Amino acid sequence: MVDDKEKNMKCLTFFLMLPETVKNRSKKSSKKTNTGGGGGGSSSSSSSSSNSKLPPVCYEIITLKTKKKKKMAADIFPRKKPANSSSTTVQQYHQQNLSNNNLIPAPNWQGLYPTIRERNAVMFNNDLMADVHFVVGPPGGTQRLPGHKYVLAVGSSVFHAMFYGELAEDKDEIRIPDVEPAAFLAMLKYIYCDEIDLAADTVLATLYAAKKYIVPHLARACVNFLETSLSAKNACVLLSQSCLFEEPDLTQRCWEVIDAQAELALKSEGFCDIDFQTLESILRRETLNAKEIVVFEAALNWAEVECQRQDLALSIENKRKVLGKALYLIRIPTMALDDFANGAAQSGVLTLNETNDIFLWYTAAKKPELQFVSKARKGLVPQRCHRFQSCAYRSNQWRYRGRCDSIQFAVDKRVFIAGFGLYGSSCGSAEYSAKIELKRQGVVLGQNLSKYFSDGSSNTFPVWFEYPVQIEPDTFYTASVILDGNELSYFGQEGMTEVQCGKVTVQFQCSSDSTNGTGVQGGQIPELIFYA
């Protein structure tokens, strides 16, 4: 038996599907029927006469109460793959639309996509119903892209002002020479499809477009992308761009990398691409962890590229000219004497008087006045994470025999591992040869081979990497050391699985690379030395 509610719903549906003329005539006949009062014979006759030419109509309206949470169209109508369009997907439309001018062939394409987001995505870079076009890119590299004013205005306040504001101009074509086509397409894809598609080679241009057209969520995504891909190779360029885009968080992240990995950053190709203002900021930096001769050589490399940018001959005079007052930000008097004598003094950039005065600064009791900053940079103070609560030694251990001691660790903030603190001999002074290594998922990130002397105490002795290694948060890295020495060594006890070092939390776990007995509870590699 059909449920009453279901019957009423079917009646309501049937009524709504009737033509308006039928509905109106039906309602009039109903009024006539009710005029006669409570069910007299004349009323019945009138009703029968009135409806003789029309089918009986059921238009009872019931009240629908929705107590449950409102569902979206996709929840009510789960997406099904049409039998006659097996290859038609939103992803394929996105791929097709990257090449522009794609009209939808199916007359009922709207029915293929249950959500407004999916239907909107079909319009991305599509000439169908487009009411504006953009000519994007510099002369000689332009691309004509279609747009839909309503969609663009919903996604950007700048587009809203352009198309619907008080000063809106009714233009069918808008030229945008200062934005790259790929970046503009990435912004359109976000506005139309609610998808963020970023690439390393276009993310800066996309950030510029997002800033220009005030699309804040896309801009934030670009900044996050840049932060996660930040390294010594691109830190200087990103520093310059972050200042231009007024992104203080990204600027701070760049400085952290540049300070800790200063020599790598200064030797990178990107350093030569920075503007003069950024160059001054870096040369003025108090916390650079770099030898001053490296800073000097980096400045000369920048000057050479700057001469090319200004179409100047590559002469010593022009290099000094483009450096200008920034030359005096290099702390030449703080170099090691050998570095100065064999490097800066013979570069030709310094005048004869400057060279003589700096030599006197090194050797004379009465030092001359210099235009150069003569105070050494402070650099960064390394932090030490000690993972053992005590150490000990016994008559039959710890021996090495060329075996690997290894431990895995993870941090909750980005840090830069500068080296390890290692134990020394428990039998008096001794020399050790140490090969230290840092890996992530089997890939070697840093290694070094060096020697160190121990004095017989239970202290730890630092062994450094050539350059600090950047460590990303929430990922386990493997620290390994192979020691070679004849004497017995101290070893750690009462190891901790988690250690708090300032604002950084370090977690430890055993490593399968360890073949000499080191683990979380005891063994070697008692300290991680890092910058944070």
Curated annotation (Swiss-Prot):
**What is the protein's species of origin?**
Mustela putorius furo (European domestic ferret)
Main location class? cytoplasm
What tissues is it present in?
Expressed in visual cortex. Expressed in visual cortex layer IV neurons.
Q: Where is the signal peptide?
A: none
Query: What is the protein named?
Result: BTB/POZ domain-containing protein 3
- Region (Disordered): which ranges? 23-54
Q: Name one Pfam family in it.
A: BACK
InterPro entries registered for this protein in UniProt: BACK (IPR011705), BTB/POZ_dom (IPR000210), PHR (IPR012983), PHR_sf (IPR038648), SKP1/BTB/POZ_sf (IPR011333)
- Keywords on this record? Cytoplasm, Neurogenesis, Nucleus
Q: Provide one Gene Ontology cellular component.
A: cytosol
The superkingdom of the source organism is Eukaryota
